[in-house]
C-alpha cells in the first residue's frame, strides 16, 4: 500500500463522536435561526421572501462555511485500494491491518469519476444525509399532514379538475420535459460536452418525471394568509398533493423500464409493463393506506381508548406510520399509502377520537410537517456545497429551465380549456395564469433527485434540480403577492370558514362531508355519498343512521354488532346533508337538528343564533355550489324520525 496508514484509535472514535455532536448542534442552531426568522417575517408581514427561501439562504451560508473553512481529516479516505480476491461486494468486510481486525460496512458503489478532492472531509461526509432519510423520515409527515388537513368540501367540488391536472397533467409534463431535454442532450453531444450513449432518452424521461413534481408550499402559505379565492387555493393545493404521489410512482415506473433487447430503445411490451406497474403500485399503495386507516377507525370505535388520550394518540400515530412502512416493505410506494391514509383518517377516524386526541393529532402532524419542511429546505442550501459530485452544465441547466416552463404551459392551458367545456363554473384566465406561475419545485423533486446520484447523468440531474428549486422558490415564491395584484385575483375571501380551521363539532364535520357536489361528476358523488352515509360511516364511526335501519333484515346480527350505541342517540341530533343531483333537479335530503323547527326558514334562523357556538359553520344556502341551473329542494329523509 502506498503511504503509511493512520489507524483509528479509541481516542479518535471519541473525537468523531464529539465532532458529530457539534455538527448536529450546528444544524440545530440553523433551525432555531430559521424559526426566529419566520417569526420576524410573520410579525412584519414580509411576503417577498418566504420562510422556505430564508431556510435555504441559511443553509447556503452554513454549507459555504463547512466547505471552505474545514480541512480533510483523513488523507487516505480518497485512496483506492485493489482487492483482486473479491469477486463481489459483501455487506460487511473484515480487514486485517497490522494484526488488528477492522470491520467495514458497505455504503454504496462509487465510480472512478466520483472520487472528490473533499473525500476525506469527515464534516462534509457527516452533513451529507443518507437519501433514504428523506423518504423514510422527513417526507411521510409532510405527505400525511397534507392528507389529514385536506379541506374536503372544496376539494371534492373540484375533484374532477384536480384529478385531471394531477394525473394527465403530470404525464404531459413528464413527456414534454423529456422531449425537450433529449433535444438539448443531442445538442450537448454535438457540441462535444457529452459522450454519445452517456445520456439516453429514458434518462430524459426520468428527469421529466422527477421535475413534474410541483411543490408550491410558498405560494400556498401566502394564499392561506391572504385568504385567496377558495377555488384557486383548492385547485392548486389538490393538484400539488396528488401530483407528488403520481410523480413518485411515475419516476419509479420509468426507472424499472427494461426492454429485453436494447435497454434504451422503445419496446411496446416493456412500455405496457411499466404502465401496469404504475397502476398496480398506485392502486396497491392506495389500498394499503386506506386499510390501515380503516383498522384505526375500528379500534378507536370499539375500544375505550378515548378515555386515555395519550394512548389513543400514540396508537393513531403508530398505525399511520405503519401504513408507510408496510407499503415500502411490500414493494409499493409508502408516500402514496400515507397520503390516502391521512385522507381516510380525517374522514373516519377523526370522528371517533376524543377532543384531546383530535387537538393532539392535529397539532402533532402540523408540527412534524413544519419541522420536516424546514429541515429539507435548510439541507437544500447545505447540499449545494456539501454534495461532493456536482456537475454544472450550462446548456443542460438552460434546457431544464426552458423545459419546465413549456411543460407547465402545456399542462395548465390545454387541460383548463378541456375542463371548461364541461364545467358550469369556469376556470378563469387569471386563475390559469396564477396556476402557471405557481409551478414551483421543492422537496419531492429534490428527494427524488438525491436518491440516486451514482452516475454522471444522475449527478447532472441533481445539480440542475437544486438550482431549479432555488430559482422557483426565491423568484416565483417572492413574486406571488405582486402577481395576485397584477392578475386581480380577489383576496380576503371568507366564503368557506373550513379553509381556515377544522370543524368544531361532529355535526359540522358531517355537514362539511355531505355539502359537496359538482355537476362534472354528480352521478359518481351521488352514489358515493349515499353509500358512505348509509354504510361506511355507521360501520367505522359513531355517526350516520344505525345499520339496523339500512341493512337488510337477514343482516340483523351483523348490523347490531357493528352499530355503535351512540348512533341511535346521534341519529336524532345529527345535522347531515346528502346531496343528490339528477338531470333536472337537485333533491337535498336534510335531517333536522332542532327539535322545534322543520322549515328551512326556521332552520336558517336557528343556525344564525347558534353561530357563536359552532365556529367555522357554513350556510348551505349561500355561495356558489357550482350546481349551475339545478333546482334546490329540501326533503325529509325517509326512515328517519322527525322531532316535533
UniProtKB/Swiss-Prot annotation:
<feature type="topological domain" description="Lumenal">
    <location>
        <position position="386"/>
    </location>
</feature>
<dbReference type="GO" id="GO:0032009">
    <property type="term" value="C:early phagosome"/>
</dbReference>
<feature type="transmembrane region" description="Helical; Name=9">
    <location>
        <begin position="334"/>
        <end position="350"/>
    </location>
</feature>
<keyword id="KW-0915">Sodium</keyword>
<dbReference type="GO" id="GO:0005886">
    <property type="term" value="C:plasma membrane"/>
</dbReference>
<dbReference type="InterPro" id="IPR002090">
    <property type="entry name" value="NHE-6/7/9"/>
</dbReference>
<keyword id="KW-0967">Endosome</keyword>
<dbReference type="InterPro" id="IPR004709">
    <property type="entry name" value="NaH_exchanger"/>
</dbReference>
<keyword id="KW-0812">Transmembrane</keyword>
<feature type="topological domain" description="Lumenal">
    <location>
        <begin position="328"/>
        <end position="333"/>
    </location>
</feature>
<feature type="transmembrane region" description="Helical; Name=5">
    <location>
        <begin position="204"/>
        <end position="224"/>
    </location>
</feature>
<keyword id="KW-0739">Sodium transport</keyword>
<dbReference type="GO" id="GO:0055037">
    <property type="term" value="C:recycling endosome"/>
</dbReference>
<keyword id="KW-1133">Transmembrane helix</keyword>
<feature type="transmembrane region" description="Helical; Name=7">
    <location>
        <begin position="278"/>
        <end position="298"/>
    </location>
</feature>
<feature type="topological domain" description="Cytoplasmic">
    <location>
        <begin position="225"/>
        <end position="235"/>
    </location>
</feature>
<dbReference type="GO" id="GO:0031901">
    <property type="term" value="C:early endosome membrane"/>
</dbReference>
<feature type="topological domain" description="Cytoplasmic">
    <location>
        <begin position="487"/>
        <end position="644"/>
    </location>
</feature>
<keyword id="KW-1003">Cell membrane</keyword>
<feature type="topological domain" description="Lumenal">
    <location>
        <begin position="451"/>
        <end position="465"/>
    </location>
</feature>
<feature type="transmembrane region" description="Helical; Name=12">
    <location>
        <begin position="430"/>
        <end position="450"/>
    </location>
</feature>
<dbReference type="GO" id="GO:0015386">
    <property type="term" value="F:potassium:proton antiporter activity"/>
</dbReference>
<feature type="transmembrane region" description="Helical; Name=1">
    <location>
        <begin position="21"/>
        <end position="41"/>
    </location>
</feature>
<feature type="topological domain" description="Lumenal">
    <location>
        <begin position="67"/>
        <end position="126"/>
    </location>
</feature>
<feature type="topological domain" description="Cytoplasmic">
    <location>
        <begin position="351"/>
        <end position="364"/>
    </location>
</feature>
<dbReference type="GO" id="GO:0090382">
    <property type="term" value="P:phagosome maturation"/>
</dbReference>
<feature type="transmembrane region" description="Helical; Name=10">
    <location>
        <begin position="365"/>
        <end position="385"/>
    </location>
</feature>
<dbReference type="GO" id="GO:0051453">
    <property type="term" value="P:regulation of intracellular pH"/>
</dbReference>
<feature type="transmembrane region" description="Helical; Name=13">
    <location>
        <begin position="466"/>
        <end position="486"/>
    </location>
</feature>
<feature type="transmembrane region" description="Helical; Name=6">
    <location>
        <begin position="236"/>
        <end position="256"/>
    </location>
</feature>
<feature type="topological domain" description="Cytoplasmic">
    <location>
        <begin position="42"/>
        <end position="45"/>
    </location>
</feature>
<feature type="topological domain" description="Cytoplasmic">
    <location>
        <begin position="299"/>
        <end position="309"/>
    </location>
</feature>
<dbReference type="InterPro" id="IPR018422">
    <property type="entry name" value="Cation/H_exchanger_CPA1"/>
</dbReference>
<feature type="topological domain" description="Cytoplasmic">
    <location>
        <begin position="408"/>
        <end position="429"/>
    </location>
</feature>
<feature type="transmembrane region" description="Helical; Name=4">
    <location>
        <begin position="165"/>
        <end position="185"/>
    </location>
</feature>
<keyword id="KW-0050">Antiport</keyword>
<protein>
    <recommendedName>
        <fullName>Sodium/hydrogen exchanger 9</fullName>
    </recommendedName>
</protein>
<dbReference type="GO" id="GO:0030670">
    <property type="term" value="C:phagocytic vesicle membrane"/>
</dbReference>
<comment type="subunit">
    <text>Homodimer; phosphatidylinositol-4,5-bisphosphate (PIP2) and phosphatidylinositol 3,4,5-trisphosphate (PIP3) could be involved in the dimer stabilization. Interacts (via the C-terminus) with RACK1. Interacts with CHP1.</text>
</comment>
<feature type="topological domain" description="Lumenal">
    <location>
        <begin position="186"/>
        <end position="203"/>
    </location>
</feature>
<dbReference type="GO" id="GO:0071805">
    <property type="term" value="P:potassium ion transmembrane transport"/>
</dbReference>
<dbReference type="GO" id="GO:0015385">
    <property type="term" value="F:sodium:proton antiporter activity"/>
</dbReference>
